[in-house]
Structure formats: C-alpha cells, structure tokens
Amino acid sequence: MSFRDDNTEEGRNDLRRPFLHTGSWYRMGSRQSSMLESSQVIRDSSISVLACVLIVALGPIQFGFTCGYSSPTQAAITKDLGLTVSEYSVFGSLSNVGAMVGAIASGQIAEYVGRKGSLMIAAIPNIIGWLSISFAKDTSFLYMGRLLEGFGVGIISYTVPVYIAEIAPQTMRGALGSVNQLSVTIGIMLAYLLGLFVPWRILAVLGVLPCTLLIPGLFFIPESPRWLAKMGLTDDFETSLQVLRGFETDITVEVNEIKRSVASSSKRSAVRFVDLKRRRYYFPLMVGIGLLALQQLGGINGVLFYSSTIFESAGVTSSNVATFGVGVVQVVATGIATWLVDKAGRRLLLMISSIGMTISLVIVAVAFYLKEFVSPDSNMYNILSMVSVVGVVAMVISCSLGMGPIPWLIMSEILPVNIKGLAGSIATLLNWFVSWLVTMTANMLLAWSSGGTFTLYALVCGFTVVFVSLWVPETKGKTLEEIQALFR
C-alpha cells in the first residue's frame, strides 16, 4: 500500500534515502538472517527503543551544555577578552537568537530529510560553533560560535522530542519523552562541573564531544516509523516499527492505526497559516506554544544562565560550587519526573510544578527585598541569604518535576501529523524567542532589583497554574492518534 500516488514523491524519497539507510543496523535486522541473529539481539522492544533514545539523547546533552556554559565561564571570559556585562549578556543570549533561526528551519528539515537526517544536519554547526569559541580572540568569533551553537540546538530541541514520541510505545512515551529534558539537565550539570576545573577554552573543546558521538550513533538506529509512513515508504515503515517493537511482537494493530491516521491526513490539502484558525489545529498549537512560552517566562533559564551571579548576590562565597550543586539537584529531580510522568500523569505534575515554582519564587523575592533593610554584617542578613539560596534550589526542583520536561513532551504528542512541521516550528520558535528575551534581560533585571526580578517570574508561574488547569489535556496512556482525536 502506498500513502501517496504523486510520482514526484518517489523522486524526493530517492533524495532522502541516504539519510535513511546508510549503515543502519535495522536494515540488517529486518532480514532476520540466521548468521547475524539480529532478532535475538533486539527481541525486547523496550531495549530497542531505549537504545534509540539514549543515542538521540546526546543531542539534548549538547543543548544543556550550551545552556550551562555561560554560568561558570563568565568571570574568566570577561577578564580574558575584556568584555563588559552588556557584551557578555549578548554572548549569553546569542545562542537563543541562533536557536530561533534553527527553530524556523527545524520543522521543514525534519519533514524533508527525516528525524535522523535533521539531527545529522544539526550536529555540524554545533561542532563548528564550539571550535569557534575555543579559538576566539575577540567578540566576533565568540558571537559567531554562540550563534552556530544556537542554530544546531534549535533544530535539536524540536527534532529529539518528536522522534522519541514517534518511536515510543504509549505505555513508555511519557518516561522516554522526559529523557529529553533529563539529558538537557545532565548537559547543564556537566558544564557546571567541568567549569570548576577546566579553562573556558578547553571547556568549549569538550562541548564538541556530544555531537561528535551523535553523528556515528545515528547510523545505528531506525528512522521514525510514523515519518516513514507519512512519506509513503511502506516497507521501511513496517521494518522500522518491527525492530522497535521486537521481531516476535505482533504489530498489525499499530501498523493499521498509523496507516489510517496517515491516510486520513493525506486526503487533506496542505495546511497553510490561514488553516490554523480551525480548532483542530489552533487549540493544540495554543497549548503547545503556551506551555513552551510559560516554561521560559517563569525565569528558569535566567536563573540557570546566571546562577553564579545570583548566588554571589545572595552572599555565597563559592558560587560556582553552589551552581554545580543546583545542576545535580536538577538532574535528580528530572529523573524523578521521568519515573512519575507515566504514573501520575502530565497535568498533575504540571500543576505541582507551577505551584511549587510560584511559592519558591515568592520566598526568594521576599528574602531579597528584606536584605535591603538589613545590615550585611548581621546574622539576619546571613539567614536571608540562605533562604534565597534555598528558594532558588526549590524553584529548580519544582521546575524539573514538571515545567522543565513536560512542555516539550506535550508539544510532541498533541500536534496533528499533517501540521507537525509547521506548528512545531512555530512553537519551538516562540519558546526560543522568549528564552532569548529572558536570558537577555535577566542580568540587567538582577542588577536593577533581585527581588523585583523574582516577583515578575512568580507572577508568570502563578498564571501557569491557571493555564494548565483550564486548557492542558491529559495525554497519559493514549496513542498519538487518540490524542489528536481529542481536538477534532
């Protein structure tokens, strides 16, 4: 059966094939040769899917390393290159600018060359960007490297959650989807840890490693079966799905469900911006954009990018060590969320997370406000400093339990297959634009008023509670096709 009869599609698929098959072990596995006994190696579907997720997780690790790099290196880079606070703020935020450009292209790239091909393309500017930073003598190479990193990360941030959602069985999709954000936090923690001991130029060279490992790893995993089905590559689609579910698993029901979904989408004309006004399109897009925007407006990236500055203003002497401690806490909390998301559900974790962030940020804001009226030599000042640090850590924990991993997961789940490229690009672009806005203003807002900055973030998190309770659907335990049917 072919999902598309257009002859031009066959020509396009010929161009895509190098991204699909070159060196892919699943092509050997599909032959089930007695010599290789591939089915014995990957019989357990959970092992097969987990292996794929762990390989693509190198992309989010790169994402996190980019986010975490600017915090431990601020003092050294500004000293070595003679940068002002404003110039370093520009450097810190330029990854977001590059990511916006990458986000615009991400949907179309992932739709044309597939999820694997998209990640291969994203890895190249990341590698070049890190090398540019490591050899920078002035702001030009520094800024160029940060932009290139951002471009690659913008593509990664869309492609990885979509790929994971499309390969994961419904019972594991929440946990596996949360691995995306868990990997981001691991990347951040590694940047914080290595930043304690390694000069900033060497740290930039180490930033090359995730994508350097990702490129060969992609040759050993199958392409997304849903993307293959959409492209009309029927044999490849069924082969990929069989490998992901195990060679002894009956995939007939899932194959037919995906075929029906793709056939239904293929009957519709290409979606344009004007078509997004229909509820089946605008509502999931609104939910996806809303969650991803509120994730950033809550200030988490501002806190992470400039955590050393925040701890210094709180009176912590070893601010970089404290920042690494926050990174460890973030990894642990995100790991807990990964375990809970398919048990407790998405909505409950989002509610707990946003409420916890609101309370934590209010505590931090009050502590900073009160410090203005207390002598720096008093015990009360030290107590308030510790309260503000505890509040920041509590905010990071709360975010990691829900608002960190789940918005990307829900975005990858709720967007209809025929608008996923367009709508996913829009949602990812808005996320990175707001991230840039928060990152660009965080240092200046903290210099203006630490208490005022955290008050603004707290108000946003309070609104997030309302947004989740009114508009975010529960997707736990549903197939992607069942989720999309909710909006019809």
Curated annotation (Swiss-Prot):
It is a multi-pass membrane protein. The keyword Membrane applies. Pfam families: Sugar_tr (PF00083). It is found in: Membrane. Keywords: Membrane, Sugar transport, Transmembrane, Transmembrane helix, Transport. Belongs to the major facilitator superfamily. Sugar transporter (TC 2.A.1.1) family. This is Sugar transporter ERD6-like 4.
